[in-house]
Amino acid sequence: MRHFLNRELLAANVMTVPVDRTIVAEFAPLADGTAPGFESCFPGWNSDIEWRSPSTPETHRIFESAFERMRIGDHVRQYLDLEREVRLYAGFLVIRSECSAPKFHLDWFNTDNQAFTMLTPLSADTNGFNLLYKKLNGDVAEYEYRLGEAVIFGDHFSHSTKPARSQKPVALLCFEFGTDKMEHWEKIYATIGGQTGMLRRPDGEFMRTELAAPRGYSASDAG
């Protein structure tokens, strides 16, 4: 098994890492408005959450360049079954200005930590939109987003946005990434298929999906 424990957060398969805030800041213009080569999904979830993602290989490369320069894959390489390199499946912005109630869910379910999510804020003021998560004992705790720091999590990490409201939308940079072996793709795709209109598979090929809230996010044991 490739699972690990964060003793500080008292939760499994989650870590916090430093990130280069100057690279993260490159995405501020995209957060402020739409641009050619991008598309959006609005899953609801007790909020006005928007996933703004690349719709072409060229715009995907913008996120991939940041992913590589930030060396995000290095933090989880030891847990992945790799042939050559850590693969970025999707990069996008998570944008919201209100959330009325928690929506606990899992990003990854029974993938044996072959896929991970990274989240980091684009600005220092997240207006209370922090990350709620469930500890191993079932208690709900809060992780406060910090500029220059990212949270990375894998399998069975139950979490939600903390309810809040902001006059100006708050944006997070998100990467979803993991193994470059196709043998794991079926379980990975079962979770993320539909979150973005385009995904890059472990083998490097691009594929189109139908935008919708990923069905894996509604796993019954997500809380």
What is the predicted function of each stretch?
Residues 81-83, 218:
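Short coil/loop linkers at secondary-structure junctions
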Residues 1-80:
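Non-heme Fe(II)/2-oxoglutarate
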Residues 59-63, 102-109, 204-206:
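Short, charged low-complexity intrinsically disordered segments located at boundaries
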Residues 53-67, 116-126, 195-200:
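Short N-terminal helix-initiation segments at or just after the protein's N-terminus
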Residues 175-216, 221:
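Double-stranded beta-helix
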Residues 17, 37, 41, 48, ...:
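Intrinsically disordered, low-complexity, compositionally biased regions/tails
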Residues 61, 168-169:
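Short, surface-exposed loop and linker segments with low hydrophobicity and enrichment for Pro/Ser/Thr
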Residues 84-89, 95-162, 169-172, 176-194:
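Catalytic core of non-heme Fe(II) oxygenases with the double-stranded beta-helix
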